[in-house]
From Swiss-Prot:
Residues 78-178 form the Fe2OG dioxygenase domain. This is PKHD-type hydroxylase Pput_0892. Its EC number is 1.14.11.-. The keyword Iron-sulfur does not apply. Keywords: Dioxygenase, Iron, Metal-binding, Oxidoreductase, Vitamin C. GO terms for biological process: DNA damage response; intracellular iron ion homeostasis. Gene3D superfamilies: q2cbj1_9rhob like domain (2.60.120.620), Rabenosyn, Rab binding domain (4.10.860.20). Its cofactor is Fe(2+); L-ascorbate. 2-oxoglutarate binds at R169. NCBIfam families: PRK05467.1-3, PRK05467.1-4.
Amino acid sequence: MLLHIPGLFDADELARICEALERADWADGKVTAGYQSAKAKHNLQLPEGHALAKEIGSALIDRLWKTPRFMSAALPHKVFPPLINCYREGGNFGFHIDNALRQPKGSPERVRTDLSSTLFLSDPESYDGGELVIQDTYGVQQVKLAAGDMVLYPGTSLHKVNPVTRGQRYAAFFWTQSLVRDDSQRTLLFEMDNAIQQLTADVPDHPSLLQLTGTYHNLLRRWAEV
């Protein structure tokens, strides 16, 4: 399942974020890549634990926890603290699959990367290239969203970032360990939850709503890992 979550940051917030990122001290993005991925990764990244990355990441996670669409689709259990990257001057990241497990710096906790997320921070008109290209069961998807919008997709997906040939592309990215590790099961629960919400709005007193809601929770109880 590939999901677009719009409007997590407004224009004024994004302007302040990008202004701060322009003044930031960047490191080589290969630092957080696995052995195979490092060969394909050509970008810049704020170091893990960088104050600006923590500030942006904290604001992002706080908003996602209040976004029903994300909560329903991801069913989050653990979240790897968001990282911030920059692509410019031909920077790109060739096709790769993210490492299955991630361990935040200084933490004993490991996060299984069931879901990957990218939050676009730069106006798409301000740079050329930089599309996030995702291969899924429906073919190849090219994603280049408005600033402040986020895409959520399975961590098992082969994906890449096309070269940025003009301007610079700032983004936040992170991984989520879901309560339900299987993507097809998560998708089924997400679709069922959407149907329940729509029926609740259309026919709030229908007796089958109670049964359908019970079925949702029984499936979640069967598949969830806590």
